């Protein structure tokens, strides 16, 4: 059995160079359970005979234990209306800082958390945002934070989920620039509304599934990002409802996959 199989367009083209070997390999699987409809089609073209698709098993991964932020930070965050920009690249930090600048007129206690994809860029991000006349604080669980802080810039690994936990909405980077997007599942599991740009080809089917469940939204322009963040911050809907939706979806995918596996085991 081949489980949660992922064949990208790039890897499919490589397999096609060895089409005879590929057919010999894939047709010998009792069942190929694909992670996406695109992968299902590629598996068929490569010679797989029995192919099933129920959804991506990444949906079924449980939440990791969050690295708690400490009492001082948690007390500060409780006084703020928070949104987060995660896995940002290049121009995306300035885009989100501009959104903050527009929204702080309406939300006096607004805090924007920025978690860049590559933390070696922190020095440049600090400089860019300071030039925008915004007050920025570099992540430090012990250092006292100015109450007027606009941007909270994270420069560490391993705490992203702790910030998702306290955010109502998350903009996921690598999607305004042509990078292909970032995996939205972690943020969705914490009940965050996901915002993304138009370039999400690496996770297109996952985003489509989240969109169908009211959990993700495309923003193609700076103005759209500002309007969408504002709308979500105004919405009093409970994130626990969204978490429950994602949990039910993951259970359905897992149970269907296990039933398929058990069916083929019993046939042996």
What are these regions (language model features)?
Residues 1-268:
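Nucleotide-activated sugar donor-binding and catalytic core shared by glycosyltransferases
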């Amino acid at each position: 059995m081949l489980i949660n199989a992922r064949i990208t367009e790039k890897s499919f083209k490589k397999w096609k160079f060895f089409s005879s070997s590929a057919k010999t390999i894939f047709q010998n699987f009792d069942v190929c359970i694909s992670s996406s409809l695109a992968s299902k089609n590629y598996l068929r073209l490569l010679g797989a005979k029995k192919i099933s698709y129920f959804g991506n098993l990444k949906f079924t991964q449980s939440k990791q234990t969050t690295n708690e932020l400490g009492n001082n930070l948690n007390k500060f965050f409780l006084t703020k209306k928070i949104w987060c920009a995660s896995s940002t690249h290049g121009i995306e930090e300035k885009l989100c800082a501009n959104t903050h600048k527009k929204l702080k007129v309406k939300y006096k206690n607004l805090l924007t958390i920025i978690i860049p994809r590559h933390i070696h860029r922190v020095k440049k991000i600090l400089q860019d945002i300071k030039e925008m006349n915004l007050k920025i604080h570099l992540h430090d669980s012990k250092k006292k934070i100015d109450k007027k802080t606009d941007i909270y810039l994270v420069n560490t690994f391993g705490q992203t989920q702790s910030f998702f936990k306290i955010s109502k909405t998350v903009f996921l980077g690598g999607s305004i620039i042509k990078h292909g997007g970032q995996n939205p599942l972690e943020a969705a599991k914490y009940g965050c509304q996901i915002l993304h740009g138009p370039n999400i080809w690496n996770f297109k089917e996952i985003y489509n599934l989240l969109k169908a469940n009211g959990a993700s939204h495309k923003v193609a322009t700076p103005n759209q990002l500002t309007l969408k963040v504002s709308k979500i911050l105004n919405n009093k809907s409970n994130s626990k409802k969204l978490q429950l939706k994602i949990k039910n979806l993951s259970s359905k995918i897992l149970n269907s996959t296990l039933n398929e596996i058990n069916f083929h085991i019993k046939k042996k």
